[in-house]
C-alpha cells in the first residue's frame, strides 16, 4: 500500500505521487511502502510549475532542493496539535526559501493542528483556522518579482 496523492485538472488525473518519508510516530512504515525520491517532481499545469511534498516530507530540506523552481508547492498533511507551530513555521520557511506560493492543507480534525494556509513567496499568509475553504488568486508576477528582487538563482 502507498500513501498516494492525486492531482486532477479538467476532470483528469494529471499526476500521482506516493509519499517517500513515512511518519514513524504514526506507524506509517507498518502499513505503507515508501516511494523513491525521484518520484518527487515539478509538473506543469497551464504554465504553472507545481510540486508536492506530502505531510512529514515538509521536514526534509533535501526535498526542498528537489522542487526548487516550482511556482506553487502543495503540502497535504495531518500534523497534530502539538506540532502546530512547527507546521506553520516550516511551511512559511518553505515559501521563503523556494520563493514560491505554498498551499499548506492540514487536517481540520479536532485532534489535528489545523493551520491550513496559503503563503506567498514573500511570506505573507492567508490563514483562518475557522474556515473550511481558503482561496486566493495567484499572481505569477509576484513570484517573478521576489525572484528578481532577492535573486538566489531561481529565474
Regions found by a protein language model. Name each.
Residues 44, 135-137:
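Generic structural detector for well-ordered beta-strands
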Residues 141-143:
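Long, non-catalytic architectural segments outside compact domain cores
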Residues 20-23, 131-135:
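A short acidic/small-residue loop/turn micro-motif
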Residues 59-134:
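CN hydrolase (nitrilase-like) catalytic-core segments centered on the catalytic cysteine
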Residues 1-68, 83-85, 89, 145-154:
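Active-site catalytic loop in hydrolytic enzyme cores
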Residues 8-12, 119-122, 138:
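Short acidic-glycine loop/turn motifs at beta-strand connectors
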Amino acid at each position: 500500500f502507498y500513501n498516494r496523492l492525486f492531482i486532477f485538472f479538467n476532470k483528469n488525473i494529471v499526476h500521482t505521487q506516493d509519499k517517500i518519508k513515512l511518519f514513524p510516530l504514526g506507524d506509517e512504515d507498518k502499513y505503507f511502502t515508501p516511494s523513491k525520491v525521484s518520484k518527487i517532481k515539478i509538473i506543469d499545469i497551464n504554465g504553472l510549475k507545481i510540486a508536492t511534498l506530502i505531510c512529514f516530507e515538509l521536514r526534509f530540506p533535501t526535498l526542498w532542493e528537489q522542487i526548487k523552481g516550482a511556482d506553487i508547492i502543495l503540502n497535504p498533511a495531518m500534523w497534530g496539535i502539538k506540532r502546530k507551530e512547527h507546521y506553520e513555521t516550516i511551511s512559511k520557511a518553505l515559501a521563503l526559501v523556494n520563493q514560491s506560493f505554498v498551499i499548506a492543507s492540514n487536517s481540520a480534525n479536532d485532534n489535528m493542528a489545523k493551520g491550513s494556509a496559503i503563503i506567498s513567496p514573500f511570506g505573507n499568509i492567508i490563514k483562518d483556522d475557522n474556515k473550511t475553504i481558503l482561496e486566493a488568486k495567484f499572481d505569477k508576477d509576484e513570484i517573478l518579482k521576489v525572484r528578481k528582487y532577492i535573486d538566489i538563482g531561481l529565474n
